């Protein structure tokens, strides 16, 4: 544990630049969180160097306090003392000392090998600069040879074998006992042969030491790529040893087998990879121990991102997907996407050690929704109909060749699918819109209530039936008309249900069905099953996880410190109550000011328009023409003052579309467009919102300015930076509260109220807080990307009288709430805006 005074004045965090005061405060706070075993919640606005601060503070602590983890050895020593009380203590202590010395020696040998690789790589780089043509020619030749080898291994097959054999289910499945689960059942992609190979990778005396590490996770691979680039900025020489980093990713991102990586969907790619491990023509990149060792050491010797790991795998002809896993034990930083850390099955498959390690979750503003989404699944009526068609056709084709066990389970699955379809049809006939249901109500006919969904789900996992059926369906689709006639006949039969649509029966849906059955076979008490009907005749069933706390509990119990970070974490109450309610004494909140001076930001609350129409953009006032016309006049006034680009966020597409419709009818659109070209985000699936943003950006960059209309929660509200001229003003129309009539939202609210009652808290107050927090987190995320650097400036304009409530203003980020200008009338708002930009123009 560190001394608070020492941390308070600590300045050396190995930062590559001279850090600002707010960055020093951030790093000191994170350092303390790790040292004291806290759960940190860090808010650092976009543009304040958050990622680099996270890296520097955590690596500094690790360099000063971290070390080799000897947990396994110490446990072994404890076992010796428990089982053999006759062994003197001094013998046990000596044994532990020998083990520690051995680990240190192994660690030293690892560092020696890595240093030799670094020198060799530097020599290679020097040669490249001297003779780049030769190097590229050799690289190209190696890649061509690797592709040829891949093609030969994947396509070489025994021509005497019936092509149908590939799709026949042959797996033997027996219902496991409680104490005896198949080791390969939940291994998330490792075949037994690969698991054995990885277990036997090295003899004990050459196994790399397990070192204390930082698990750094974020939502997307691109965010993790950026993180690795930030780590590269650090000067290795200032640390006691060069930084060892490894990036874990999915097969889709790391596979170098060209015949496999092109497969879609991702589930097909995963299944093909596993299949090639056990086949006679195994993947040529799944190499033996020595080559895996080489990959591991090369990956640790230099800081590599995903693309560089793929290039390394191609150069060494070793699978990066499995090779990176061998580097985890000795890495100081492991970067990985959310699912690999937050799903238990993924952690077990990767054999990740949580105990005493440090966990940093970046871009954590949507962590609650992300965890719930990972452990939820849905299936639509159309998908169920397609699944029934495909399963019946598959069963007709292979029934006589299936053994009794497989025949029984496939018939059970068909029965379950039939019951799902019957449930949908009954809901459609009774015009049911939405409701919460229980699993038992889905399985009511033909003896389906006697089927053990848990065992059936396990059978699907072991047998790989979904891949077999999807593969067979694609194969049938590729054949001539004679084979297609039977499927087309089935299509006519299956889909002549009066619903006015036909669906292509060749669409792969069995993987989706398997995922859905897995969830309803193991329903968590904190989850709910819903029936939903939105538009048309394609309702869906959805299993939704309501309480994510169980999935972070193991992190807080085992990790030394868990730290959440984001540009806009406010309001943080939900993180505490929904994720860490039993760990509140460990919570360390931190929110820093923005890097820009206060005079570069103005926040204006607008309660009414120029005509005096009160601004309260509720759902029931969506069609209020007077309200929308006065909103248009407000924009006309504002954009006469605001230079360059203006971004406007609406609470929903329906609100945006209705506003544009009213403006077009009253000539407001033309008047707006005369001052600034208008760009409107579309809801249409075929339109790419990034194209809209690119056109807006081109207009602003060309000096024509622009006004971009977007939607909170849409593609343009996250991940895009509206810095400098792209966002001299960011406006938010209304407040994006969730739909209180939505059945899923009602279930979430009920769950929050139940939990509040259990803790003796006012239930209605808790649900109201949850309601407001959900809204304000979305608002904060949308407006948080306007300022990107110290010299940037922008106005934040919130158009709704409800923003004047003190309970709402408290949920704004600290850096934004310190300079709020509010008035009941429109005049002061326009004057404040003019004053702000007049001052900025004088500075320019």
Swiss-Prot record:
Q: Enumerate the PROSITE patterns for this protein.
A: HELICASE_ATP_BIND_2
The GO biological-process annotations, alphabetized, read as: DNA-templated DNA replication maintenance of fidelity; establishment of sister chromatid cohesion; interstrand cross-link repair
One molecular function GO term is: DNA binding
Q: Where is this region: Disordered?
A: 118-161
Principal place where this protein is found?
A: cytoplasm
- Every copy of the Helicase ATP-binding domain together lies at 9-418
Q: Where does [4Fe-4S] cluster bind?
A: 255, 273, 283, 319
Residue ranges for motif DEAH box? 362-365
Catalyses which reaction? Couples ATP hydrolysis with the unwinding of duplex DNA at the replication fork by translocating in the 5'-3' direction. This creates two antiparallel DNA single strands (ssDNA). The leading ssDNA polymer is the template for DNA polymerase III holoenzyme which synthesizes a continuous strand; ATP + H2O = ADP + phosphate + H(+)
Disulfide connectivity for this sequence is none
Q: What is its EC number?
A: 5.6.2.3
Recorded hits in SUPFAM superfamilies, A to Z, give:
P-loop containing nucleoside triphosphate hydrolases
The protein's required cofactor(s) are namely: [4Fe-4S] cluster
Binding positions for ATP per the UniProt entry: 44-51
Q: Where is the composition biased (Low complexity)?
A: 149-160
Physiological role: ATP-dependent DNA helicase important for chromosome transmission and normal cell cycle progression in G(2)/M. May have a role in changing DNA topology to allow the loading of proteins involved in maintaining sister chromatid cohesion in the vicinity of the centromeres. Has a specific role in chromosome segregation during meiosis II.
Q: What is this protein called?
A: ATP-dependent DNA helicase chl1
This chain's source organism reads Schizosaccharomyces pombe (strain 972 / ATCC 24843) (Fission yeast)
